[in-house]
A protein has these predicted regions:
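Short, acidic/polar
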Residues: 31-49, 91-99
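A short acidic, helix-capping loop that chelates divalent metal ions and anchors anionic groups
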Residues: 23-29, 146
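Active-site groove signature of glycoside hydrolases
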Residues: 45-64
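Conserved radical SAM core fold
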Residues: 20-25, 116
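Short acidic capping loops at alpha-helix termini that bridge into adjacent secondary structure
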Residues: 11-14, 18, 51-55, 82-86
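Alpha-helix N-cap and loop-to-helix initiation/capping positions
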Residues: 2, 29-39, 66-70
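Beta/alpha (TIM)-barrel catalytic core signal, keyed to glycine-rich beta->alpha loops juxtaposed to Asp/Glu
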Residues: 1, 6, 60-167
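Solvent-exposed, non-membrane alpha-helical residues enriched in polar/charged side chains
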Residues: 4, 8, 38, 42-45, ...
């Protein structure tokens, strides 16, 4: 809603990119269908106060979703309905990214890339460039590690995803 207020407050052209799917319960591949995803898109449209979302990304769906043509057909339906202009995916692995860009209407891929995670530069970036697919970098500061605000003694809450690096 805050972003929606910002959009209303300016005469400048603002392009909106958002993600959907992560709040599916349960979060599994079967949930990536029009009946489950469209209500999330509708809520985003309402909260943002826009008629169409410029870029809607699927937020790290289960791996099997990337090779399921129905996943992309669902997104194509949302484009046809005028609810989204373009769509992309947010991925965990290079393999998921390469699978997603096999589908012609995928316009962007959000992928982890930073000084510690360089694998996308080996193959994915080249393939994305060949297909003119936008790349959005995730976790560029390695979840805060590269900010200089953490050290070997930094402690995280028990449910903080950064704990996986400690062991």
């Amino acid at each position: 809603k805050f972003v929606g207020e910002l959009i209303k407050s300016t005469s400048e052209q603002i392009y909106v990119a958002t993600k959907t799917g992560r709040r599916l319960d349960p979060h599994n591949a079967d949930g990536y269908n029009i009946n489950q995803i469209e209500p999330f898109v509708d809520r985003s449209l309402l909260n943002l106060g826009v008629d169409c979302i410029d870029l809607m990304q699927l937020h790290c769906p289960p791996t099997e979703s990337y090779s399921n043509s129905e996943t992309y057909s669902m997104m194509d339906q949302l484009v046809e309905k005028g609810k989204i202009q373009y769509y992309g995916v947010s991925v965990e692995t290079v393999e998921e990214a390469l699978e997603a860009i096999k589908y012609p209407n995928v316009k962007s891929v959000q992928i982890i890339f930073n000084i510690f995670r360089q694998k996308p530069s080996e193959k994915f970036f080249v393939e994305a460039a060949k297909k003119n697919i936008a790349v959005i970098v995730r976790v560029p500061l390695a979840s805060g590690l590269l900010t200089g605000k953490m050290n070997i003694n930094s402690q995280f809450a028990s449910n903080d995803h950064r704990n996986y690096n400690i062991e």
